[in-house]
Every structure is written in C-alpha cells, then in structure tokens.
C-alpha cells in the first residue's frame, strides 16, 4: 500500500521565543463597544494591545488579547507560566531564550525566568543609576565621532553589574553607546547569558528581535489579524487564534519553497496574489471533485512545485 501523505508538523526545535509587545506597528484600533478596549492617548483612539509570541524562525506560538496598557509584572509572569507549561508538555528538552523590550523587564519576570531555567535578554529603560556607569563612555564616544564624522556613527559597549531597587539582586547589564549626526543614543539590556563579548550579545543576539516586527507585519497586515470587531472579548480572542492558523498555513507554504529562491523570503501577500489567487474550474463528480487549473499562469513552475508540497500542509 502507498504511504499516506506526510502531514506538516508544527515543531518548535529552535531555542528562541520572540516576545513582542505590540507597539507602533501593531496597535489594534477598534471602533465599537468591544470588551477590554481602552483609550490610547498616543493614537487618540480606543483599541487593544495583544501579547504576541513567535519563535526565532518565525513560527507563531500564541497571541493573547488584552487592553492597550502596559502589562504588570504579575500579569506577565502568569502568562509566561502558562506558556512554559504548554511548551514543556510537548518539548521538555527545548532550551528557551526570552527576548523582549523594557515593558516586560520587571522583577517578577527576572526572578521567574531564573527560577525556571530560562535564558533571557531584555531591554532596560535608562535610569539615572544606569547612566552613572557610562557617563565617561558617552563623552569619549561623542568626541570620537566629532573627530571623524565622515566615518559614520561611533558605537561602543560596556558591561557592568547593577539593578533597580525593586530587583532581588544585581544583574548583568550591557550598555550600547552610540554617537552620530542625530546626537547620542544609549541603550541598556539585561541578560543572564554566558556570552562574554558585549558587542556580540547586543548585535548578534538581542538585535535579532527586530525580525519579529516583520512577523507581526505578516500576521496583522497581510492576514488582517486586527479585525477584532466582535463585542465579546472571547470572540475576538478566537479571531486571533483563527488568524494564527492562517499564519501557520502561509508560513508552512513559504518554508516548503526552495531555500535559495525568492519565494522562500516572499511576503504573505505576494504568495497569496501570485500562487493562491489563481483561476480554476471546479467540476463536481459522483465520487470526487476535480479542479482544472489554467494551462498557463504567472509563476507556473513554482505553482507546480507548491502543488506537490500541499500534502505536507494537511494536518
């Protein structure tokens, strides 16, 4: 007997969780009386601010509907606890690195990650205490840029141990100091990783979280995940899950493409317009439904390849 078609399995072999706080590009504006909506002064609108999680390769993990306000440490810890329980139930040996911005860098999160064996690298909001460590470095970096402005921005790094008064212990802090024509720019991150080089920690580990904004764009813009017009919060949460399923289908379609082809990095809307929106003739027969595709269409070769991979998307 022939072997059944291999189903596409949503494995999570990678070690990084991209924890995204929906910011400027992901504000979910609403125009009705939906539950959990709050007013956002920045946008001058009512809306939601869901927590969205991806892994390091773009797999969709989860999305939780919530009001448009900064989450507290206890809320974040409770969310992390449920998320880790679900991951460990299926992938008990997967190592997890949590990357997130300063809105999630709270003492509750730091203590919980340490107690549960999670690696983390989080953005830290600048404070007077932290700036005391890099005052001289900022001055020398600015002088270096002014001495040779044509060479571009000057960037330097420094690491030290310090912490906020609310933290239970001091943490390893990495400061990135940059000077350019636009003025000085300093960022701080906190981490428990063993990587020694501060530049590698910031540029090769932390900065990769910027790719998550592209995942957010694919989910929200190309798949219309911001259509949360139901009155009940549970109904809008279900909408997020349905759009998560759509994301998985499109992501699975994209990763089935040849590795060195343009389709492997194509946006979801490109895949939909070029490969999915193809005219076809559907014929209903007694024992089957036959689909007749056009004899010619754009990207016909890649379409033929995609049709051969469709069984992998069946779950």
Label every model-predicted segment.
Residues 119-221, 280, 307-315:
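An anionic, glycine-rich sequence signature occurring as long contiguous blocks
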Residues 98-106, 126-128, 234:
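Acidic, metal-coordinating catalytic cores used for nucleic-acid/nucleotide bond scission
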Residues 10-28, 58, 97-105, 120, ...:
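Short, conserved catalytic/metal-binding motifs centered on acidic residues
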Residues 197-238, 242, 246-254:
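Short amphipathic alpha-helical "interface-anchor" segments enriched in bulky aromatics
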Residues 38-91:
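Electropositive, glycine- and tryptophan-enriched low-complexity nucleic-acid-binding patches
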Residues 1-52:
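Active-site-proximal, Lys/Arg-enriched surface segment
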Residues 110-119:
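Short, surface-exposed basic-aromatic patches at helix termini and helix-loop junctions that form
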Residues 249-315:
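A short, flexible helix-boundary coil/loop motif
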């Amino acid at each position: 007997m022939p072997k059944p078609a291999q189903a596409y399995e949503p494995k999570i072999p990678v070690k990084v969780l991209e924890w995204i706080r929906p910011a400027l590009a992901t504000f979910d504006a609403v125009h009705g009386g939906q539950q959990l909506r709050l007013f956002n002064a920045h946008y001058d609108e009512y809306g939601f601010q869901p927590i969205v999680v991806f892994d390091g390769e773009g797999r969709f993990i989860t999305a939780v509907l919530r009001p448009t306000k900064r989450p507290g440490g206890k809320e974040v810890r409770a969310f992390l606890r449920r998320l880790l329980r679900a991951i460990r139930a299926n992938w008990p040996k997967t190592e997890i690195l949590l990357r997130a911005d300063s809105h999630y860098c709270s003492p509750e999160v730091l203590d919980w990650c340490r107690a549960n064996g999670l690696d983390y690298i989080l953005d830290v909001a600048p404070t007077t205490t932290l700036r005391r460590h890099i005052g001289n470095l900022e001055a020398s970096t600015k002088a270096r840029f002014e001495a040779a402005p044509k060479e571009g921005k000057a960037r330097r790094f420094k690491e030290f141990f310090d912490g906020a008064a609310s933290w239970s212990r001091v943490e390893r802090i990495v400061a990135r100091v940059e000077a350019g024509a636009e003025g000085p720019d300093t960022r701080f991150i906190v981490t428990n990783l063993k990587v020694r080089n501060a530049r590698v920690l910031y540029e090769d580990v932390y900065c990769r979280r910027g790719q998550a904004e592209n995942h957010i764009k694919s989910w929200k813009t190309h798949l219309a995940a911001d259509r949360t017009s139901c009155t009940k919060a549970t109904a809008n949460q279900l909408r997020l899950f349905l759009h998560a399923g759509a994301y998985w289908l499109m992501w699975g379609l994209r990763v089935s493409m040849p590795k060195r082809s343009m389709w492997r990095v194509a946006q979801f809307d490109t895949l939909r317009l070029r490969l999915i929106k193809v005219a076809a003739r559907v014929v209903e027969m007694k024992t089957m439904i036959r689909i007749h595709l056009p004899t010619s269409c754009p990207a016909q070769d890649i379409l033929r390849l995609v049709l051969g991979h469709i069984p992998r998307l069946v779950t």
